[in-house]
Every structure is written in structure tokens, then in C-alpha cells.
Amino acid sequence: MKKAIQFGAGNIGRGFIGGLLSKAGYHVVFADVNQEIIDKINEDKKYTNFVKDVESSEIVITDISGVNSTKPELIDEVKEAEIITTAVGVRILPIIAPSIAEGIKARKENGSEEYLNIIACENAVKASSQLKEAVYGNLNDEEKAYADKYVGFPDCSVDRIVPPVRLDNPIDVVVENYYEWNVEEASFKGAVPQIEGMNLADNLMAYIERKLFTLNTGHCITAYLGNYKGFKTIDESIADEEIFKTVKKAMQQSGMALVNKYGFDKDAHFKYIDKILNRFKNPYLVDDTARVGREPLRKLSATDRLTKPTMTALEYGLPVDALLAGMAAALKYDNAEDPQSVELQDKIKANGVKAALKEVSGITDEKILEDVVAIYEAM
């Protein structure tokens, strides 16, 4: 029996990667700290993905089990796995790394020569590489040499909107029809697993930045502008003509940065932008602006979805006014239930908008900082 472990039994884990692994013939073990969800997975041994779009459908995911990721039983699962995936949030990767390391140690002690590939499916650049660094921090030199030979950490980019919709069954999930999972082929160890829906890529960074600069950039700007105007959901926000125009323009500006950097076909990329805008309009996905906008400090950071495309566009001498409007809207994001939002607003109150933006984004270009402040103050 082929075994896969999916760290994170949340909406993305169940509604995207876990489902693809199950369809590919793996027994999928969901590892999570939420004992209630783990118990329900073990009780039902199946759940349903409700695909919500113009044409809706239901996909039943079977051959699953669950394990509490804080329990020693997890190590036994890692010992037997062929593939491990994660959907826990990039900040949690260092927390799960020791368990993965213990499993690798156990494989070495057992003399296992089976290959294991570990793919961190997170909204972050090179998340698997980050996880590898955290795992290797828990291994000695001999264990690292074993992992170098038998354990792969292919980086990937993932794209699927899975909103937190409450259903009668807590493990059922609502998902959009569209998804994309691009995985770096050269980093696999052993035979590359055959998983329908997993696209093997040789220039992964182009895919990662295409997704980051397009879906992630457009999504968060929609959320921040929508939140500023009092809208609660993404589809309500993008239906506002002014927001739609700003978001589309920002995505086209980040898109031109990609065209210049990677040689993407402009017409094809602009069609990709239109496809994503239509995904935002999907009325069947009730996606909160608070969810999409959460953690503004991370989203304003130098390598993330607002600052990175802006600075890349500037490298090529391209206009960035709509991207700067997105930054200004992020600085306006005030949500008492989001610790990063509270911290951001505290920084603004203490030091002013310009100093706060400079600190969180790493931007040193005075004109850009002043342009964002001007947009912020005009809002």
C-alpha cells in the first residue's frame, strides 16, 4: 500500500493536496493537532469536496486516516511514507520539522533504502527548502548524509481557493474548480510519483512568481481595498468598479514585471490575469476579506506579494502606481482580531506611515515611500 502523509488537515490539506494524493492511489494519513478533526477522519474514513462554480460537483475522498501530529505514532507513519506534503502555513514548518527528522532517523536506523519526497505546499517561496533547513537542524552529519541520498525536498507552487465555509460535516470542504500544483522535477529522489494534477516544472521560480505576482497580489489588494470600503467578501469587493479597475491594473503592472523578467508572452499572461479576476468574482465561494488580508506584515515584507512585484517592476523601469495603491490599502488594514494588523497599526501610530512601511517592507527608495504615503493620506 502506497502511503502519503499530509501535515495539516485544514481546508487546503483536505480540499486540495490530500484529495489529489488519494485519487493517485495513496492511503493518505492526515497529521494535525486538531484532535476533533483527526477523530472525525478516523471515524468516517472519507469526506466530500464540494466543487462550487457555474457547474458544481461533489468528489468523495476515501482511503484516509488521521494521526495527532504531537503523538509518537506520527513517527511510525513517517517511517512508512513514500511522500509527505504540508499545508500548515510557513510559520508552522519549523514546528513540524522535528517529527519529520525523527522519522528520517528511524528510517536510517531500520536500514531503509526507500526514497521519501517531502513537498511543502505553502503560500511561500521555496517552502520545501525552508522545511529542509529546519529538518536538517535536527539531524547529525551521518543522518544528513542519509537524507541527502534518500530524501528529496522538491519546491512547489500551489494555487486553489478553499474558503472556510461551515458545513454540517466538519471535514467536508468547499473548493473552487480551478487548481494548479507545480513541482520542481529535478529535486525528487528516486522515481517521480505519478500524481494526476501535479505538474512537473523545470523553471519553478517562474511559476512561483507568476502565482505570487498574480493571484496572491490581486487577491490581497482586493481584500485590503474591499475591507477599506466596508465589504466583507472578495466577490463583493471585486464587484465594485473602482476596486476592480485598481486590482486589474496592479495585476497588469506586476504582470509586465514577469514578462520582462521571464519572457512570458504578454497576451497569454493577460488572459491568465482575466481568468484569475473571474475566480475572484465566483459568488459560490464566500471568501472573507479578513481571511485573505490577514497577516499584513508578512504580505508587505520584502519577498512577498506586494513589495516583491513592485520592486521587480521598478527594476525594469515600469509603472507601479496601482501596486502602490495596494500597499497603501494594506497599511489601512485595521483588524483587532489579527495580531499582525494590530502590530502594524501600532507601528504607524508610534512612528508614522512612512517609517512603518520602510521597516516592514525594507523599501529604501524615498520617492516610492512618499508616493505610498500620499496615496494613504488621500484615501
Task: Please state what every model-predicted region is.
Residues 1-5, 11-379:
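Substrate/ligand-engaging "lid" and interaction regions
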